[in-house]
Curated annotation (Swiss-Prot):
Residues 863-883, 902-937 are annotated as: Disordered. GO terms for cellular component: cell envelope Sec protein transport complex; cytosol; plasma membrane. Zn(2+) binds at C941, C943, C952, H953. This is Protein translocase subunit SecA. Signal peptide: none annotated. It is found in: Cell membrane; Cytoplasm. The lineage of its organism: Bacteria, Bacillati, Actinomycetota, Actinomycetes, Bifidobacteriales. Keywords: ATP-binding, Cell membrane, Cytoplasm, Membrane, Metal-binding, Nucleotide-binding, Protein transport, Translocase, Translocation, Transport, Zinc. It is an enzyme of class 7 (translocase).
Amino acid sequence: MVDIVDKALRMGEGRQIKKLENVAKATNALEDEIAALDDEELKGQTAKFKQRIENGESLDKLMPEAFATVREASKRTLGLRHFDVQLMGGAALHWGNIAEMKTGEGKTLVATLPAYLNALDGQGVHVVTVNDYLASYQAELMGRVYRFLGMSTGCIITNQKPPERRKQYNADITYGTNNEFGFDYLRDNMAWEKSDLVQRGHHYAIVDEVDSILIDEARTPLIISGPAEGDVTRWYRQFARLVLKLNRDEDYEVDEKKKVVGILDPGITKVEDYLGIDNLYEPNNTALIGYLNNAIKAKELFLRDRDYVVTGGEVLIVDEHTGRILPGRRYNEGLHQAIEAKEGVEVKAENQTFATITLQNYFRMYDKLAGMTGTAETEAAEFMGTYKLGVLPIPTNKPMIREDKDDLIFRTKKEKLAAIVRDVAKRHKKGQPVLLGTASVESSEVVSSLLDVAKIPHQVLNAKQHDKEAAVVAVAGRKGAVTVATNMAGRGTDIMLGGNVEFLADAKLKSEGYSPDDTPDEYEKRWPGTLAEIKDQVKDEHEEVVKLGGLYVLGTERHESRRIDNQLRGRSGRQGDPGESRFYLSLEDDLMRLFNTQLVARVMAKGMPEGEPIEAKSVSKGVRTAQKAVESRNFEIRKNVLKYDDVMNKQRTVIYAERQAVLKGADIHEDILKFIDDTVLSYIKGANNGSDKPADWDWDGLFKAISSVYPIAVEQEGAKDAVDKLKGDKAVEALKELIVSDAKDQYSDFEDKLGSEGLRQLERRVVLAVLDRKWREHLYEMDYLKDGIGLRGMGQRDPLVEYQREGYQMYNSMIEAIKEETIQLLFHVDIERVAMTEDEETESDEDEAVNAAEAVMGLDGEAAATGESAPAEPETDDEAEKTTIDELADEQKNEKGIVGMQPISHAEGKVPANKRPKSEELHSPWADGRTFPGTGKNAQCPCGSGRKYKMCHGQNEQ
């Protein structure tokens, strides 16, 4: 099936390549003409192109001239001329494809072509890389080309402050990592001031190492979180000690393949005895099960120096695909705290999600998306299905002559490692550079220690030495170099035989005190001479290493993904250089042990001689089968993550659009008046007990509830008399008009005291405060819903459909709550205080007045915006058509599968199991004086009455 899909996707590939070749030919035809321009004339091309775009000329028509201009600027600044295949790659990127270009083909230089072309219309271009170092290095190096042509370059890196970020985003071309771009988007949607925004829209993105970012990292959503309420760190420490007393397969079981654990009956007994409780599964003890499962996972499934490292008293996650540390990332749902307790470091507070988005949905926001990688072909179907990106293989500039040897497979890891050391010693003795690829920090340190014993000098590059990554890789191709590195995916510095000329030239100039940022004129002046000097030094060594066979890549084990194996191999044989690659495997490697156990057992039973490699096609086939099994599993995980996030994505898009409109000064006065109408109507319908007759309505409950929203002046008896002779909808409408008229009269008095502009500003700040808080609560509820939704499958119901349905119900309930609490807050704000604030033209007192009103109502008035935002003001029309909150709510009522849905209990989505009512309580009469702690007041009451909690048992809360 996969082969059929792959063939279908490749239909028409020849025609596409022909189009790319035509672009290269058209660009070449202009080369002499552009080369004849002096520096000032060449720089003047940019202004001419912009004018032609203003006059209506398309970017496609400009492309050959723009590419020829960039090529000439690159020759004059960097001494690098784009090859024809690089021009083809640039055209593929401009047309919104993935350009599959082998390692060493100059992808960084290729990006300058479409980046310059697409920046001409002034909307900004984002070039996405895998780490801060590469973002800085590429922005600095390629920025010389852009600056020569009058284009500005920015770079987004960790720890920049909002004003600096805004400046970088305002540049024509901005480099940065996928995480920084994504988190800035989330922070922009938590900002409280228009001046705090940093991004300016999502026009065009070029993603380097696109498979690493859009495939490998797509399983993990971006999350901004803050401390949750309550201190539960002692439980993590207690369970970390407890699980040390439990034995695997006796007290609990572990499935390493699926990464799940389960407690067995003997283990349950031990846990209950240790904690001094009678029944671990009683409702009051339910939360303890989560601590127990996380403690077992931390003990058995998450290993130090493989999944994480401990540095400076912190547990830092290691990216399984690239071997890099992921600063700031934490496992969720209490797992990170369990690992911290296991390692004996400070257990940090649990977090609550404030904002989240998957990488898939973030990058799908761009008007145009493109990417580059050396290994996209195996994931072509996923790129097309998820991102609508085609994959175009770009020919190499010179033929590939690397020799890829068959795998050598040993029975045990010990035998494999001994053979690896012998092979490396032989290669090192003759001076051939060797790159050893490992799958984890732990493996790299084991290999390093064995090389130390063999007295083979070497460099180690793993998550613990990530700061010297580029320097190590730049010299990994020198004669006699031996480099041990964790996964090479995303290592953006080329391994050049004899040494990386550009890197060494840049390092020499910087050591002499020259930099393209601080001393650009002197740097550019000295660059050609320094580059020529380094080239001469490297040339002889390059030729010597070529004679020795080029770079030898030795993989110490197969990775779960064939792509990452191919990326490791691809470090050798760049630009027509010779090279060699081979993988050493053992039947004890995780990939074989977990995913091909029967084959392993069969081969081991044959009793092969110790130290002899196994040569069997069945074993090599078994490796490929195991890799395909893991790739298939990971693809399903990514698909699942996306399906569930798509439910949230539409909601998030509308909420964020509404929030941005408010933040930028939209007049929402008419919305506020409608909120009053909707809130009053909701209360009346909630109090009618299903009866058409006003005499049967709960008048006491209704007036008590409405008086909590605003100081109602309508007399209860007078209201009853006014609708006594009416029935059904007429009675509801008459009562609504009576109460709404009273509320709007009082609200009009506020406007008289504050003035129109003063009230408009207050309305915006109150809506932001309420919207942020209710959105956080909604994310919290949706997390709880998703955690337990898988169990619906046991009842023959599709968990995803259930999640969609209940998620939309919860969303609509949140919208009601936003309307109601906005009105409630506005009527509780100290108007005199706000009026004084307006006179002084300050906002801090106004915010305090809003917070004080929240405190009166028992709400948390703190803004969610933790962390500093940054992008520039989006260049969008404030009057542009947008979907409103109400429109989405109405639309969702008509969604397929949503019609006729019964209301759900928010308690199931939000309240932890140990706080939920017992089943025998669910049918109790509503006026029995009980309360259900933790239930949202706009949620349906857990008693089963069908009423909102605040109109039911919530009335009994003090």
